[in-house]
């Protein structure tokens, strides 16, 4: 029963689109119809600046972390806990409150990973920061950190988390597919930090 309750909470929390919420609160254009059209922190950086992007990043990561922490509190463990994290990411990608049009899941993945294992989460965040600092492409940082997440999970000895973390990584790569096509064509926008 605790697992089912955790799954429901994770999906409902994951469905909170902080890009849309922050845009409304700050009286900014809807990120789903402006910039890249993505309801995420990188597009909010373009649409509303650093402060708006920071709030979105914080909110999207926090909901993933909180979903996992609630499940931990309810004594959900091992692969079941990692599946709760996966459902939080699915909520972000396909939010029930926003007609199933969500973001790409990177910040939520980071929050989930911090909740599963502080060190795995920290290394994934560090990987993203290093890659975006070098290449200035959020999509490249997303790809590298998504690929790194299952690798770090194995290195940390948390093979019980591996299958759900692998699914999260595949979903994030899939959601960035258009970005990778733009990278190939040389039309992908760089991030201005």
Swiss-Prot record:
GO cellular component, one term: plasma membrane
Residue stretches in coiled coil: none
Membrane topology: Multi-pass membrane protein
Record field: catalytic activity: an acyl phosphate + sn-glycerol 3-phosphate = a 1-acyl-sn-glycero-3-phosphate + phosphate
Subcellular compartments: Cell inner membrane
Primary location: membrane
Disulfide bridge positions per record: none
Enzyme Commission number(s) from the entry: 2.3.1.275
Pathway: Lipid metabolism; phospholipid metabolism
One annotated GO molecular function: acyl-phosphate glycerol-3-phosphate acyltransferase activity
Any Pfam family hit: G3P_acyltransf
Domain of life assignment: Bacteria
GO biological process: phospholipid biosynthetic process
Record flagged with keyword Transmembrane: yes
Keyword annotations: Cell inner membrane, Cell membrane, Lipid biosynthesis, Lipid metabolism, Membrane, Phospholipid biosynthesis, Phospholipid metabolism, Transferase, Transmembrane, Transmembrane helix
SMART domains on file: G3P_acyltransf (SM01207)
Membrane-crossing residue ranges in chain numbering: 2-22, 51-71, 78-98, 112-132, 154-174
Family annotation (PANTHER family): GLYCEROL-3-PHOSPHATE ACYLTRANSFERASE-RELATED (PTHR30309:SF0), INNER MEMBRANE PROTEIN YGIH (PTHR30309)
Oligomeric and partner information: Probably interacts with PlsX.
Family membership noted in the UniProt record: Belongs to the PlsY family.
Annotated function: Catalyzes the transfer of an acyl group from acyl-phosphate (acyl-PO(4)) to glycerol-3-phosphate (G3P) to form lysophosphatidic acid (LPA). This enzyme utilizes acyl-phosphate as fatty acyl donor, but not acyl-CoA or acyl-ACP.
Protein's name according to its UniProt entry: Glycerol-3-phosphate acyltransferase
Gene responsible for this protein: plsY
């Amino acid at each position: 029963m605790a697992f089912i309750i955790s799954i429901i909470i994770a999906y409902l929390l994951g469905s909170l689109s902080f890009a849309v919420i922050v845009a409304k609160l700050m009286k900014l254009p809807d990120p789903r119809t402006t910039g890249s059209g993505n309801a995420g922190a990188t597009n909010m950086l373009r649409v509303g600046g650093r402060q708006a992007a920071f709030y979105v990043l914080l909110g999207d990561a926090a909901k993933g972390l909180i979903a996992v922490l609630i499940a931990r509190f309810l004594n959900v463990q091992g692969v079941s806990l990692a599946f709760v994290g996966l459902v939080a990411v699915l909520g972000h990608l396909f939010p029930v409150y926003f007609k199933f049009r969500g973001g790409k899941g990177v910040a939520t993945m980071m929050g989930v990973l911090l909740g599963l294992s502080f060190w795995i989460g920290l290394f994934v965040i560090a990987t993203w920061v290093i890659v975006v600092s070098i290449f200035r492409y959020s999509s490249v940082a997303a790809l590298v950190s998504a690929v790194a997440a299952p690798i770090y999970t194995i290195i940390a000895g948390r093979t019980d988390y591996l299958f759900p973390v692998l699914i999260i990584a595949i979903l994030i790569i899939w959601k960035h597919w258009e970005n990778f096509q733009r990278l190939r064509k040389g039309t992908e926008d760089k991030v201005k930090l």
